[in-house]
Amino acid sequence: MLGRCKRIRIGYPGGCTIGARPVDLHLDAMKKMGVLIRETEGEICGECPEGLSGAHIHFPISSVGATENALLAGVTARGETLLENCALEPEIMHLCHFLQAMGAEIRGIGTRKIWMRRAAALRDVEYTIPTDRIVAGTCLYAAAATRGHIGLKDVDPQEMKSVLRVYEKMGGQWEMRSGTLRANAAGIRFPVEQVCTMPYPGFPTDMQSILMSVLLTVPGESRIEERIFEKRFQIVEELRKMGGRITVTGRQAVVCGGRKLTGTTVCARELRGGAALVVAGLSAQGESVVKHAEYIERGYERPDQLFGQLGAVIRIREQVEE
């Protein structure tokens, strides 16, 4: 927006209440590119009358969103831009390839250091968005929770390496055949000694609560350490309503699995936690109701149809205000 309009006025970003998500890295990057930032109550105003200028930006903390914002700004800025300590998530690489297709000159794709220079003009292109690795991982783990078989088309196992590694540790088997990842969860029965969420290529924080639902179906004691967002464990209270035995100490959760969950009414408080409650409901005895499905719909298009392809019977109905 700044590259095109030279002026913005936006509300502070919201999103899921999973922990601190400051925007200082974004604002600092824009300031280095010549943007005058003014923060008022509930709003961020920015302007660059002469347009954006290329800059050397070093992120003190690796951030997916800040890297993406700086990339988008950099391809419209005068001169050259160098980003250091960039996030390594596959989504960054895909964004770079998209911008390259539009005519931007970018080097260092897939590394911590990305260099770019503005093209004379960005052109229209047709671009196919790759498969969402977190949605694919959710489907894989949903089948794991019910010990089912699943085929996932057009997924990149390299992007899901950490998720598949945990799947294997639990006893699941998978293979790539004719462009489809085929997985068999019939052998899942082993607890996981320790899983720590980490930036890519580590185990994704977005899969943590979904894994927790799966581990409740596995006999024995498993441990999860959440190193990214401090409020990811708010799902624990809801899983306990279904009979889940989970103990939380700080950023570590101990999951005692093997006891059959019981369907009940639970409440989604954020996107991935909501998906995890659906996964728990699929493995539970009886019917489960997940309130505030709008959280889930933010990240899963038509979740009733998505999980329906796995054999689940899911209906989404409008929630009546209490």
What are these regions (language model features)?
Residues M1-E322:
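Structural preference for solvent-exposed beta-strand-turn elements
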